[in-house]
């Protein structure tokens, strides 16, 4: 059963919802476009919580009625039927309680943002670079399934078709909310194409996921930037190495360096490089802020400093294991083609469960 503090909060939200419903029916509000739109937005934000709370109250009433029936009923068959229904209602109540708690959690302000993903080959030489390319294709496939757009910012390919590093933007509603869990060290176990003896090797690649920041969200003083141009080696056809379209930007105070050379024009490369710089600076400032308050758990991941592996792709066993939630799938090919939702959905659920646990530990400590 929900704690009194939570019930009080939900009743407060329901009361406000009813107030808004009443206001939206008034002529003076209907005629005031801005006020009407503002109230519609406020109602939309809390409508799901109110619907879920009303469902909770209905189920609670059903549970109480069934408990009374079990207690009072003389007929054994009817009592047995009521007990079965009671078990079913109890399960539904627990599910709705969890959903209500999850709805009350503060939203991550970056969840709806586009993202910048960076994949870097780790230990394993050429095989690690090939694995980095596999991961890029996996995320490309996932983005396509979601109807999101992918733009390469910069890449450092190898002779065998791998990537020492590839940086790309994923544009689409909720991209950060789904892909933020991919940050960390990914590990592959397989026989490399460069291996003649057939021995299984272990290689790694690091994935970083950063929310794309608007100019107003991350202030950059132009005086803090050193901008250089160079001859691009990107997809420029006859323009390759003939025009200085590549752009390298250094943020002097932080030492962060970003470069982009995949577009034909210097202007496009500069624009993309600035997007990456804003995202990296946001992460840099977040980390500084967390260090100042001695936070033990960094919220921003993907800096390449995390040594623990988050997921292993085992080719001989066709198995993918996410070590954070101790979950394995034996659909390796499907996962690498972009079927990631079975992992992402479980990771989102695990995060919510952890947040709820912490929230109610705090509530318990203050009540």
Swiss-Prot record:
Belongs to the prokaryotic/mitochondrial release factor family. GO terms for molecular function: translation release factor activity, codon specific. It is found in: Cytoplasm. Its main location: cytoplasm. NCBIfam families: prfA, PRK00591.1. This is Peptide chain release factor 1. SMART domains: PCRF (SM00937). Methylated by PrmC. Methylation increases the termination efficiency of RF1. It holds the Pfam family RF-1. Peptide chain release factor 1 directs the termination of translation in response to the peptide chain termination codons UAG and UAA. InterPro entries: PCRF, Pep_chain_release_fac_I, Pep_chain_release_fac_I_sf, Prokaryotic/Mito_RF, RF-1. The lineage of its organism: Bacteria, Pseudomonadati, Dictyoglomota, Dictyoglomia, Dictyoglomales. GO terms for cellular component: cytoplasm. The modification N5-methylglutamine is found at residue 238. Keywords: Cytoplasm, Methylation, Protein biosynthesis. It comes from the Bacteria.
């Amino acid at each position: 059963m929900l704690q009194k503090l939570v019930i009080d909060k939900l009743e407060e939200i329901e009361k406000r919802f009813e107030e808004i419903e009443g206001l939206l029916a008034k002529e003076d509000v209907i005629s005031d476009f801005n006020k009407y739109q503002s109230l519609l937005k406020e109602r939309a934000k809390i409508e799901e919580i109110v619907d879920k709370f009303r469902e909770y109250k209905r189920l609670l009433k059903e549970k109480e009625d069934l408990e009374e029936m079990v207690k009072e009923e003389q007929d054994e068959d009817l009592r047995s039927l009521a007990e079965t229904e009671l078990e079913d209602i109890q399960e539904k109540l627990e599910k709705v309680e969890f959903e209500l708690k999850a709805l009350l959690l503060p939203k991550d302000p970056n969840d709806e943002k586009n993202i910048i993903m960076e994949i870097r080959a780790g230990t394993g030489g050429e095989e690690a670079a090939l694995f980095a390319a596999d991961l890029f294709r996996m995320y490309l496939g996932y983005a396509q399934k979601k109807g999101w757009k992918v733009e390469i910012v910069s890449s450092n390919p190898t002779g065998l078709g791998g990537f020492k590093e590839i940086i790309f933007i994923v544009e689409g509603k909720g991209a950060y909310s789904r892909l933020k869990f991919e940050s960390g060290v990914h590990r592959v176990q397989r026989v490399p194409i460069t291996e003649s003896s057939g021995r299984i090797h272990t290689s790694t690649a690091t994935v970083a996921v950063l929310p794309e920041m608007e100019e107003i969200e991350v202030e950059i003083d132009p005086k803090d930037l050193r901008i250089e141009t160079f001859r691009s080696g990107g997809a420029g056809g006859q323009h390759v190495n003939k025009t200085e379209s590549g752009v390298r930007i250094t943020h002097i105070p932080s030492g962060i360096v970003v470069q982009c050379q995949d577009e034909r024009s210097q202007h496009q490369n500069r624009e993309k490089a600035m997007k990456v710089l804003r995202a990296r600076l946001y992460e840099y400032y977040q980390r500084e802020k967390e260090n100042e308050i001695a936070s033990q758990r960094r919220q921003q991941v993907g800096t390449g400093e995390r040594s623990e592996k988050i997921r292993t792709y085992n080719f001989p066993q066709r198995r993918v294991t996410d070590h954070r939630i101790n979950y394995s799938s034996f659909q390796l090919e499907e996962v690498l083609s972009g079927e990631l939702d079975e992992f992402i959905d479980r990771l989102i659920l695990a995060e919510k469960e952890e947040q709820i646990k912490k929230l109610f530990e705090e509530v318990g400590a203050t009540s």
